[in-house]
Amino acid sequence: MTTTSPDALAPAVVPNFDDPATEGRKLAIICSKGTLDMAYPGLVLANAALGEGIETHLFFTFWGFEMINKKTMNDLQFTLLGNPATHMPQGLGGLPWMTAMATSKLKKSIAEVGVPEIPEFLEQIVASGGHLWACRMSADMNHLTEDDLYDQVEGIISASDFIEKTEGAQLLFI
C-alpha cells in the first residue's frame, strides 16, 4: 500500500517493502557523470525502483561526485559541446554564453514536469529508503572528506565495499 505525504520534501509515494514481488530485489546504480543531463537518469531510476519497493543503492564516483559535493551540487551544468543529441551545430556549443543558456533551458524543462532539483531529489530518495555512497578513490583523488559531501551520504567506501553491500543486485552504470 502507498500513502501520499503532505510534506513537499518527503516522498510522494512511500513504498511497501513487504510486497512479495519485490522481496529480495536490489538495484545498484553507479553515478559517474557530473553534468546536469547525466545526473538525472540515475536519480530517476533510483526513485522509480524505490517506488516499487526495491532496495536501492547509489554509488557516486569520478565526476558523479559533483552531484553530492556541497560546493557543486547546486550548480551542475549542461553543455551542447560534443553532445550530438542536441541536434545543433557543434560550433555553437563553444560560444561563451551557450552553456549557461542550455543549462537554464534544461532546468526549466525539468521543473515543468515536476522533477525536483538535485539536492531535493537526493533528499526524496533518502526519505524513501535509498542509500547514498561515495567512492573512496574519488574522494581521495579530489581531497574530499565526508564534511564536503551532501549530509545524507552514508559514507565514503571502496568499490569493493560497494560490491559487498550490493551483492546480488542489478547493476546500472550511468
Q: What is each model feature region?
A:
Residues 147-174:
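Glycine-rich, aromatic-bearing surface loops/beta-hairpins
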Residues 28-39, 68, 109-112:
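Short, glycine-rich nucleotide/cofactor-binding loops
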Residues 56-62, 133-136:
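Short internal beta-strands
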Residues 2-19:
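Positively charged, low-complexity intrinsically disordered leader regions
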Residues 68-78:
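Glycine-rich loop at the start of a catalytic domain that most often binds anionic cofactors/ligands
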Residues 119-128, 133, 142:
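A short aromatic-anchored loop/beta-hairpin motif
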Residues 40-53, 58:
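Histidine-anchored nucleotide/phosphate-binding helix
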Residues 76-110, 114-117:
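A glycine-rich helix N-cap at a beta->alpha junction
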